[in-house]
């Protein structure tokens, strides 16, 4: 526990100290910044804001985790666990970095195509499974203490879980501070679970990432001076999925990650309903004002027809939802 606290403090200090230099370098080199949705007019002023800040907090958290773990790793099993989680973080961070690089440096608006990104994510998921999950012998999902055997189909579950939540966190990263603190809330919850399970190596990784993210948030809260980019969001989503697998609490991510599930579901519902109504009525209709869901809240509150919400209001609401969901999981696991 002490080493976890040390890792969190070091990560926070290094991340908070380094980020201004990253922002300044970005601005001095006149690198193109984040592009904004024209439909949300209050976001247009953010055009050109430095992005790819996730590069900094990922490097910091990874380096600190490895450094501090040298004093705590006692066996090869712990080393395999840490390397497994860090490997998926690094792999998905590289995928996100490539996507951001193409958008910003090569001026390719869409970055990687959807098919290219999915292919790389699947390759990363396969590497994670065959190098770290399969050797551990895990082939079942723990649901409320009951082991649901999947056999070889656990491979497909891992791919779905990692790819799905990496993209879900990516969709959540749409307004200042939303994704960073939402992930912190999720990580704190998994930190409690790891502590109860005496999984102190996982707890150390969680502490390092929480510290690095809080250092990043010092510059990502409204008005944001930097965004995490795909390099950060894809890696964070994959990390949450990997941690839920490592702790054998996969099902909890559906509740702990309710914000990411809500954001992703809103997009899927919107697209499906639009296509259905266009085919049936000749014109597409929408359920939400705009998706992902945080934009719907911005444009008209919960109903979509009320007063516009500020980014702080949206943040507070979704952080609150995530916090309550996390408390519910802890209550289910350790109270009821």
UniProtKB/Swiss-Prot annotation:
Its main location: membrane. It is a multi-pass membrane protein. It comes from the Bacteria. One of its GO terms (molecular function) is phospho-N-acetylmuramoyl-pentapeptide-transferase activity. One of its GO terms (cellular component) is plasma membrane. Keywords: Cell cycle, Cell division, Cell membrane, Cell shape, Cell wall biogenesis/degradation, Magnesium, Membrane, Metal-binding, Peptidoglycan synthesis, Transferase, Transmembrane, Transmembrane helix. It is found in: Cell membrane. It catalyses: UDP-N-acetyl-alpha-D-muramoyl-L-alanyl-gamma-D-glutamyl-L-lysyl-D-alanyl-D-alanine + di-trans,octa-cis-undecaprenyl phosphate = Mur2Ac(oyl-L-Ala-gamma-D-Glu-L-Lys-D-Ala-D-Ala)-di-trans,octa-cis-undecaprenyl diphosphate + UMP. InterPro entries: Glycosyl_transferase_4, PNAcMuramoyl-5peptid_Trfase, PNAcMuramoyl-5peptid_Trfase_CS. It is an enzyme of class 2 (transferase). NCBIfam families: mraY. Catalyzes the initial step of the lipid cycle reactions in the biosynthesis of the cell wall peptidoglycan: transfers peptidoglycan precursor phospho-MurNAc-pentapeptide from UDP-MurNAc-pentapeptide onto the lipid carrier undecaprenyl phosphate, yielding undecaprenyl-pyrophosphoryl-MurNAc-pentapeptide, known as lipid I. Belongs to the glycosyltransferase 4 family. MraY subfamily. This is Phospho-N-acetylmuramoyl-pentapeptide-transferase.
